[in-house]
């Protein structure tokens, strides 16, 4: 799955021009109270969304997700509190706009012309294609004419519109069902589990789900790349809409939008079934032996990220040894281990402790101008490449008018460290920058798989426990010699 990089300059210019065009329709210019005034008086921006790791989710560290962070920044821009409410059904999202229970929708929704009857859209903040999926191992359809089973999509989704258009123009015999009680993500999971033959999904969601459901396979692209947008009420009052366009222009201009996309989508790349399957098997069979050590020595690092680093380094093999002499779970050099007080590099606890301490030292060493949530990627590049070479990549970025404090800019320069055109002018010389690039991207993918897979296991365990508890209430345990009197 290849994603088209959005032209953020074009987005910013379009947003600015639209904001200027809407200027005459802003009520406060005529002394009237507009939607933006009501939001500020209320002190809340009400946003409808759906629950998804990519879009909006809550955990022990609070809410997260691409749409959540973008909406939170918009609320901060307006000077109000964000109130984000998840809904299960896409139709419910638009009902909240119609009933004025929400000011906008931020739910990773594809642009859909049919929705323009009920709402209007904001600028695109990333793009996806619609794809048909099936379960790996079953016959792969090459077109809709090859479908040999049930096709179901989420009610109210853009996929419904796409299928209607295809039936009218190309596949008159095409049939499908729609589900109001299952989300698009749930339908994708049902295909992966063999409970449903086919469904449609967006390319980004599918790519992320494949990290924890590798048997989910893409049959073919149904559409070209399409924009993902927010939705707003249809209204002659343009006050909120104009503020949103101004906000987008600023996000584009200062690089914040590109950095958010990098944070949530930068690791979405090619899918390796065998590697993913092997990793998930290792989570079940190998990780339990080392998980307590990762949790114990993680420090300021998420233990799951530390575990992902160790898997990239050694595949969780404490006896691992490279031709260059690095050894152990965290593949420490003899010199690094000595400096960290690690006496036995193949001792799992010593190796994990040493690797964690070394990485945290690198994070503290990273320049303060780098944002907090991006420091880890610079530190990981330094962990793999050497701190000096990471600084060279930042210098190259600055010389090429990029932002040396932005990981999305710097990572693109890492491969240049091995190119003769560039490395002679660097301070620390030649380095295998392409390996550091792949190193960090692999770790990010492993972390996504690990977090998602463990969450799925915990969710299923909780559901099983709830069912067992209900069964226990319905059928009380009867001990030997006891009797139940009616």
Swiss-Prot record:
Membrane topology type: Peripheral membrane protein
Its main subcellular localisation, reduced to a broad class, is membrane
Q: List all disulphide bridges recorded for this chain.
A: none
**Which GO molecular function annotations are given, in alphabetical order?**
peptidoglycan lytic transglycosylase activity
Q: Does the keyword Transmembrane apply?
A: no
Q: Which family does it belong to?
A: In the N-terminal section; belongs to the bacterial solute-binding protein 3 family.
Query: Which protein are we looking at?
Result: Membrane-bound lytic murein transglycosylase F
Q: What is the lineage of its organism?
A: Bacteria, Pseudomonadati, Pseudomonadota, Gammaproteobacteria, Enterobacterales
